[in-house]
């Protein structure tokens, strides 16, 4: 039966509906906010796998073009593989939801939020998040919900709940917060150098609405009726010889956990575990049935050792204290032919960033249901398997897209406006080594490579990943976490920014009791770390170079009247093509009359600019041109001053000082002129130049009549 509930969230009602659509799914909710509607469904497989150490969850957010009344562009007129935006929204939904599923359920779970309608004002991603969370909570799949999500913008010193696209564009803060009734579980967003206090206040504002939406879902359960949950595939089991295993292995495992160097440490831990396996197999205490439980017990011991060392001794596996940052080495200009390059190495994490400058033709065109967009800044993050000493396929996965997006948002606010720097900018980050925080290393190397390329960025940007180990009311915040600290810890909080404020952030929390004070402490510690990293980066390069790379394309801009655009283009593009071919430049003409020239030869570009200026310039009496003789007749010659203007050079004298004969005949003149250069009026005829079609001559505008016809006279050198 159809059930509907609504709640005022910001300026619109959030409407949740179930019982009408997709009734064969385990759970289905239709969510509407303003004119944006998303249907979210959740299904699970019939069979389960035992002893999984992960949740087999997949989230497939997708947007239908018909939602905006559009047909897909290109040759294929149906939706294809997921766009980057759909991947990013899928990750937004996945991350806060995944820790709330019980691993013992064992079945594959698929959540599919589908945008069915959009008003192109209210972003459908937040609608899709709440639809997905509600669908799972109402389903028969075991889930420790409810959870909800809210977006906050900060505009004119005021917080806006679930802002419109325009408000997000104008805001200095765009933050998405997800959480449960117990606390915040995820934060992600970008900003324009906001303070830690503003960020915390935005999270507080979001959490008030999150609690209301969670209570709305609980009310929904009361109306619809709580469904009996599907059974767990297995009960939590532990290795029955865990005590003996601990006595046998704990001391050696503890020593292995503190071996210096990631690869050496991993190898040492692996050898200790292998030794334990061989011993317990020999006494028939490990077999196929309990092998998974055996290795899980070893992992539990490792986690216990690492966490206890941090909580009790403030000692991390690589020997650092909680606030200490790994050694940093940075340099620029490694690659000679690129437009800008930088290498940032922090401990065993290394990112090589390369900046390339292109023209407006290189912009990425986005065919999107929210409206077509042109992106003139892109950051692509690559994580090859060799960065962690492994083999594998070289491909771009969801993780790469997500990490690249976070780094891009962190740098974007510091870039110049397109009108001030009309280049297309592409930054590629190659992760060459990885042991935690590679996305923040990308921010650091990307910022330096932009400066090295001569992009006038406002400020240097650095990033740091923060971690957390907690037990009860006690917690220790970690600066610059390792990969294992991310895996074994309770939080991954990435913060990027300048010396003035925060520009990008992403937080995932595995525990439910994260307090405001804890987040405040984490942000304060992150700021100290960020300042330290910025000081090292500034010692290498502290400001953008005055000039762009000699290898980058040059740009010249000029403005013409709108009604002169057709003159520059010419009939069927003839004029602009001639300029392009002759001067080896690209010409970009905007509808507002702004013309941009792209090329590599500065001299040719200046000549192309002069040609365009001459085309659109209004002729004035007395101006001198170097024109081409286009046609000669008995009265004179037609001279092409510009591709769009011609003047007439007459051979008939206007006074006694005008002494030119018929230009088509001999250099001594003809007709009434005598052989000796004197005519019947006793005027002197100089030897005029012989003019031929195609010849270049220097002329001066002597007169312009009321019809715009131009009369010329020769200019003698």
Curated annotation (Swiss-Prot):
Ranges for region Disordered: 650-683
Domain KH: from-to ranges: 553-612
Keywords: Cytoplasm, Magnesium, Metal-binding, Nucleotidyltransferase, RNA-binding, Transferase
Basic and acidic residues: compositionally biased ranges: 654-665
EC annotation from Swiss-Prot or TrEMBL: 2.7.7.8
GO cellular component: cytosol
Binding site for Mg(2+): 486, 492
Cofactor section: Mg(2+)
Domain S1 motif positions: 622-715
Lineage per the UniProt record: Bacteria, Pseudomonadati, Spirochaetota, Spirochaetia, Spirochaetales
PANTHER family: POLYRIBONUCLEOTIDE NUCLEOTIDYLTRANSFERASE (PTHR11252), POLYRIBONUCLEOTIDE NUCLEOTIDYLTRANSFERASE 1, MITOCHONDRIAL (PTHR11252:SF0)
Function: Involved in mRNA degradation. Catalyzes the phosphorolysis of single-stranded polyribonucleotides processively in the 3'- to 5'-direction.
SUPFAM superfamilies, per database record: Eukaryotic type KH-domain (KH-domain type I), Nucleic acid-binding proteins, Ribonuclease PH domain 2-like, Ribosomal protein S5 domain 2-like
GO molecular function: 3'-5'-RNA exonuclease activity; magnesium ion binding; polyribonucleotide nucleotidyltransferase activity; RNA binding
Transmembrane residue ranges: none
GO terms under biological process: mRNA catabolic process; RNA processing
Record's protein name: Polyribonucleotide nucleotidyltransferase
UniProt superkingdom: Bacteria
Chief localisation class: cytoplasm
């Amino acid at each position: 039966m159809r059930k509907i509930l609504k709640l005022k969230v910001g300026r619109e009602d959030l409407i949740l509906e179930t019982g009408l659509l997709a009734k064969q799914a385990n759970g289905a909710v239709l969510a509407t906010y303003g004119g944006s509607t998303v249907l979210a469904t959740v299904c699970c497989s019939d069979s389960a796998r035992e002893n999984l150490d992960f949740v087999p969850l997949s989230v497939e957010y997708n947007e239908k073009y018909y939602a905006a009344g559009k047909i897909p562009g290109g040759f294929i007129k149906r939706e294809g593989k997921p766009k980057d935006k759909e991947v990013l929204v899928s990750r937004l939904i996945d991350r806060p939801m995944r820790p709330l599923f019980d691993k013992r359920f064992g079945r594959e779970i698929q959540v599919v939020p589908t945008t069915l309608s959009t008003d192109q004002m209210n972003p459908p991603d937040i609608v899709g998040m709440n639809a997905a969370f509600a669908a799972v909570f109402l389903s028969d799949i075991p889930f420790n919900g409810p959870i909800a999500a809210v977006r906050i913008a900060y505009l004119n010193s005021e917080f806006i709940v679930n802002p419109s696209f325009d408000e997000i564009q104008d805001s200095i803060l765009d933050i998405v917060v997800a959480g449960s009734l117990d606390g915040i579980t995820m934060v992600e967003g970008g900003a324009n150098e906001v303070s830690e206090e503003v960020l915390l206040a935005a999270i507080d504002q979001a959490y008030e609405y999150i609690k209301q939406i969670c209570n709305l879902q609980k009310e929904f359960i009361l109306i619809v009726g709580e469904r009996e949950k599907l059974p767990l595939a297995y009960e939590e089991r532990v290795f029955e010889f865990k005590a003996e295993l601990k006595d046998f292995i704990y001391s050696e495992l503890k020593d292995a956990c503190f071996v210096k160097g990631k690869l050496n440490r991993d190898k040492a831990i692996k050898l200790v575990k292998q030794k334990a396996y061989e011993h317990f197999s020999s006494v028939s205490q490990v077999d196929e049935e309990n092998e998974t439980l055996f290795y899980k017990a070893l992992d539990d011991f490792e986690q216990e050792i690492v966490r206890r060392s941090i909580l009790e001794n403030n000692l991390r596996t690589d020997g650092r204290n909680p606030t200490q940052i790994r050694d940093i080495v940075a340099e620029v200009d490694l690659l000679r032919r690129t437009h800008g390059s930088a290498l940032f190495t922090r401990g065993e994490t290394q990112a090589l960033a390369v900046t390339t400058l292109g023209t407006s033709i290189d912009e990425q065109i986005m065919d999107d249901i929210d409206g077509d967009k042109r992106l003139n800044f892109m950051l692509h993050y690559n994580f090859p398997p060799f960065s962690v000493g492994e083999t594998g396929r070289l491909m771009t996965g969801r993780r790469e897209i997500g990490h690249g997006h976070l780094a891009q948002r962190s740098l974007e606010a510091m870039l110049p406006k397109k009108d001030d720097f009309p280049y297309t900018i592409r930054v590629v980050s190659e992760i060459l080594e990885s042991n935690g925080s590679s996305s923040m290393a990308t921010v650091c190397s990307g910022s330096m490579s932009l400066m090295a390329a001569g992009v006038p960025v406002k400020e240097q940007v650095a990033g740091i990943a923060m971690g957390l180990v907690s037990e009860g009311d006690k917690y220790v915040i970690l600066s610059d976490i390792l990969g294992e600290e991310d895996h074994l810890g309770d939080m991954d909080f990435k913060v990027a920014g300048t010396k003035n404020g925060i520009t990008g952030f992403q937080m995932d929390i595995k525990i439910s009791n994260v307090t405001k004070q804890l987040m405040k402490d984490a942000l304060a510690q992150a700021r100290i770390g960020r300042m330290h990293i910025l000081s090292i980066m500034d010692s290498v390069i502290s400001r953008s170079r005055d000039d762009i790379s000699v290898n980058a394309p040059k740009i010249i801009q000029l403005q013409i009247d709108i009604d002169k655009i057709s003159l520059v283009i010419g009939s069927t593009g003839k004029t602009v093509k001639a300029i392009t071919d002759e001067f080896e430049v690209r010409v970009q003409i905007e509808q507002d009359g702004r013309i941009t020239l792209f090329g590599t030869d500065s001299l040719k570009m200046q000549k192309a600019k002069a040609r365009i200026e001459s085309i659109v310039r209004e002729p004035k009496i007395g101006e001198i041109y170097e024109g081409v003789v286009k046609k000669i007749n008995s009265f004179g010659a037609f001279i092409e001053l510009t591709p769009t203007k011609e003047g007439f050079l007459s051979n008939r004298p206007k006074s006694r000082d005008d002494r030119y004969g018929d230009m088509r005949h001999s250099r001594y003149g003809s007709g009434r002129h005598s052989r000796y250069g004197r005519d019947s009026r006793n005027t002197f005829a100089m030897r005029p130049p012989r003019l031929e079609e195609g010849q270049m001559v220097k002329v001066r505008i002597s007169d312009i009549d009321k019809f715009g016809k131009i009369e010329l006279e020769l200019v003698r050198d």
